[in-house]
Amino acid sequence: MPELITHCLVGEKIIEKMDDKKIKSLLEGYRKEFLLGCQGGDLFFFYNYGLFKNKKHIPEFGDRLHVEKVEEFFEEGIKYLKENSSETLFSYFLGYLCHYAADKQIHPFVYKKSHDVSTMHHNIEFMLGKQYLLDTKGEDALNYDMEAPFDFTLSEDISDFYIHIAKKLYSQELSRDIIVKAKKDFCEFKVKTQHPDIQYKLLAKLAKPIVHFDPMALVYKDKNDWQYFTEEEYANFVSDILSAIDYSIKVIKTAYDVVMKNKNLKKYMSFFDGTDFCGNKHR
């Protein structure tokens, strides 16, 4: 992923820049659903977070959404939308497309800089997000309203979409309760790690040798450490964000044409070209 704040900022800028009045009205009308959609499969990463808890393979499902059957996901998703009319779900799905655009554009840089070391990967993403928020809104990530992206009741239309996709493409059993809990746990974890208490820091220290990852990498630092990336690299990151925003607007318009104007899938599917959320080609 880029982290939550980056995805929210991308989504907000897409709404602002959208020049199709009908689509803009849809996204503004279901703004919270759209912005949660911008978190994509990250929704499942923190299900039942904590050591030794039964996670029912839900976080792994979030990982699989990023790398397995990505084209099939977007094809099956758009077909499902054509058969199951829901503005709530459609807005969420359009946000999911934006998650893909941002991940696809930014992940190659992060993987290269982190040398595929997970702790370094997250440190870089959190520092990039912190700096981007400061530059675009003059706000510190430590003061960001982490509850705002989750402050709504998840529609059953969205849950039922995931249940369908998970079973058909990934042989993963989900339920409405699991999906609602995933959203709740995502929110709780982001709030907890924004200002981690002594308990979290202690548990992070205990967990590190067990999970081979430093949970403190999921915490926004008081200030950025520029050893992780140069100012030139940060400027390239911002350029990649702007490219992802433009890409998102194009794919949103194409998806809208498929669902609302019954256009064929060919142009829409061309946006995915065998590339997963990590920027890796699978064909």
Indicate residue ranges for each PLM-predicted region.
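N-terminal leader/auxiliary helical segments
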Residues: 1-94, 100-283
